[in-house]
């Protein structure tokens, strides 16, 4: 064989080996990247798996143990709920009864929030409303709607059917005072876009839209209005916030599902398991530790009404009047 052909063949072989090595290195780096939680932009693990404190998905104790686990934490490491279908927990008629006046002519969000949109969105979060026994699952749905109804309420003290029948009257903040844009290299604000409160949880600020969009697979930085124009995305954004821990805050889900165990510091701050801690997670800096507060009472009123519809006990520690606020976490929801 002529020497030049041999050299050419050897060179091709070297190139092939180098290419295969680079491909292997790329696959290795991708497989070693963190999968969930704050290490992955707030992403949730698939199939209801636990997200460990280091950003990995699994269903054994190292992944699911508290404290540490960031989201979808289940004692003993059993993945919660097989499908995430909540139709067996909340019926269409219960949804309509809870949000009795959401389609009232006076409500700007009339016609927007639907039962089917909620059920569809919930399927993307297998642990939501499917963790624990039936009573616990119903309490979680009641707590979620209790908090989000306060965020979107159109009720007043003498409203027909009472103030707690008017949740989900709004789908976005009215007359926002700012663009809610904080300079960020990671989550830069898109030209002409505003990041005021939208959806059931009134998602606010560009970094929250960025984190949420990355987790649910939608570009919300460039399209924040989707949270107010697409009901499924609106519910997904709210449930994402609910399911995502904000260290040192636990997730709302972990609290209501009985997975969160308060530390000594939490106990000293008056933060004990119950609905009140969820209020602290969502808006504690403005509402908690101030004694009696009408906003906190409003959140409780919605929750108690919904628990009554589901026939479950709301439990204790419902308020955060005497709780110290958590230090600011990564996310902020309420306005």
From Swiss-Prot:
Active site: 151
Top-level division of the source organism's lineage: Eukaryota
Family: Belongs to the glycosyl hydrolase 19 family. Chitinase class I subfamily.
Motif Vacuolar targeting signal: chain residues: 329-335
Gene name of the encoded protein: CHI-B
Keywords annotated in UniProt: Antimicrobial, Carbohydrate metabolism, Chitin degradation, Chitin-binding, Disulfide bond, Fungicide, Glycosidase, Hydrolase, Hypersensitive response, Plant defense, Polysaccharide degradation, Signal, Vacuole
Record domain Chitin-binding type-1: where: 34-75
SUPFAM superfamilies registered for this protein in UniProt: Lysozyme-like, Plant lectins/antimicrobial peptides
One GO term of the biological process aspect: killing of cells of another organism
Tissue: High constitutive level in roots with lower levels in leaves and flowering shoots.
Main location: other
Full protein name: Basic endochitinase B
Keyword ATP-binding: no
Lineage: Eukaryota, Viridiplantae, Streptophyta, Embryophyta, Tracheophyta
Single Gene Ontology MF annotation: endochitinase activity
């Amino acid at each position: 064989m002529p020497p030049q052909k041999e050299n050419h063949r050897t060179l091709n072989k070297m190139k092939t080996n180098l290419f295969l090595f680079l491909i292997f290195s790329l696959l290795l780096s991708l497989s070693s990247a963190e999968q969930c939680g704050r290490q992955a932009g707030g992403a949730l693990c698939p199939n209801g798996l636990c997200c460990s404190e280091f950003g990995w998905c699994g269903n054994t104790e190292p992944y699911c143990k508290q404290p540490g686990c960031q989201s979808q934490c289940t004692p003993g490491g059993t993945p919660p709920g097989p499908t995430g279908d909540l139709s067996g927990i909340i019926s269409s008629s219960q949804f309509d009864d809870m949000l009795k006046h959401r389609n009232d002519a006076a409500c700007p969000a009339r016609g927007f929030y639907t039962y089917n949109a909620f059920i569809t969105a919930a399927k993307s979060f297998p642990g939501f409303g499917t963790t624990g026994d039936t009573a616990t699952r119903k309490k979680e749905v009641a707590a979620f709607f209790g908090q989000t109804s306060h965020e979107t309420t159109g009720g007043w003290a003498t409203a027909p059917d009472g103030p707690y029948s008017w949740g989900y009257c709004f789908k976005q903040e009215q007359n926002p005072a700012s663009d809610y844009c904080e300079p960020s290299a990671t989550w830069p604000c898109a030209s002409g876009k505003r990041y005021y409160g939208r959806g059931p949880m009134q998602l606010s600020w560009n970094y929250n839209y960025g984190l949420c969009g990355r987790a649910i697979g939608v570009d919300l930085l460039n399209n924040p209005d989707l949270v107010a124009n697409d009901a499924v995305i609106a519910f997904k954004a709210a449930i994402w916030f609910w399911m995502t821990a904000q260290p040192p805050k636990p997730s709302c889900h972990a609290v209501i599902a009985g997975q969160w165990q308060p530390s000594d510091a939490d106990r000293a701050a008056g933060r004990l398991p119950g609905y009140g801690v969820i209020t602290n997670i969502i808006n504690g800096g403005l509402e908690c530790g101030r004694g009696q507060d009408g906003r906190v009472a409003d959140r409780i009123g919605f929750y108690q009404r919904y628990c009554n519809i589901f026939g479950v006990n709301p439990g204790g520690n419902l308020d955060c009047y005497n709780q110290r606020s958590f230090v600011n976490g990564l996310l902020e929801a309420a306005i």
